[in-house]
Amino acid sequence: KKIFVAVVQLALRERYQNVKIGILPTYFSFGKAQEKLFSASGIRCKDLRPVGSLRNSIYLDNCQDPLSRYEKNNSLVFISQWKRGLCLNPTNNLYRAWNQGHRRTFQAVYHYAISHSIKLHVILRNTFDHVDNMKHQEKYFMDAVESSEINFLSSKDNELASYPPAYSAEIAVHFLSTLGFEVFGHGRKVLCCIGLGGGKEFVEEFGVQELIEELPKELLLFDDDEGRIDEMITDLRKMSNHDYQSLTKKARNYYMSAEEGKNTHERIQEDISKILYSKKYA
């Protein structure tokens, strides 16, 4: 009996290493970047379908006021990527570099918000494999800036709760976050600061070239220089929405290839139904 297998991408991943499966079945990816990442990892996919983000699509479809996500809000958000193994006593040089880059990005954004009198929200990462993870995550950020006056946003009770603040912020800043790319794909102003992990050398060792190479230079801090974050955020804030949409159109489609006029979750459902019918699985 034939069994149909499909994989749906839910998060960004660096290059795959020591992969035991060389060929993937039908794969619903965020965008075209995944094809290059698979190729660089020595993985072949029989049927790769760039469709955008499933979770983001579900959120937007259920949003009571979809237009609200385009309203300008005078606030910044920092998207946390706190992970226990990376941020709590990292065990190797790569993890330590990642941790420092993530921490320095937050510190720079925090100080920008203070100096420009702008609200800053920190969207916490859901991580519950240890009961004290969220406590350690909050402490990580408070220790980084020696302050407990931080507005943390947690989506513990609602998997989609991280989307509204990311959409409503004037600028979203991240180190290399799935959520950051999701809202970028739908036109929000987003700054990626992966370079603070150690510049080009870190990016190559971490294996994320394919995830950043199509980002416009105005949206990517590739150099190991947190001093540039202040200027880059200011420039993005000053950029008109029309200019921003024109600048990012190609990259948005490259990373989040949602078909215009069709929700990603509906597209996946339709594609699977057609495949099952044509292959006589059903």
Q: Model-predicted segments: where are they?
A:
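Active-site and donor-binding regions of nucleotide-sugar-utilizing enzymes
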Residues: K1-I58, A161, G180
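Hydrophobic beta-strand scaffold residues
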Residues: K2-V5, L120, F152, V190
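Short, solvent-exposed loop/turn segments at secondary-structure junctions
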Residues: L10-R13, A33-E35, L54-N56, Q81-G85, ...
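Catalytic binding pocket for nucleotide-activated donors in carbohydrate/polymer assembly enzymes
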Residues: L24, C45, P50, E146-S147, ...
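Structural motif
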Residues: T26, S75, E170-I171
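Conserved catalytic-core segment of nucleotide-activated headgroup transferases in glycan assembly
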Residues: N56-M142
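Donor nucleotide-activated moiety binding/catalytic core segment of transferases
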Residues: T127-H186
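C-terminal alpha-helical cap of glycosyltransferases
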Residues: A258-A282
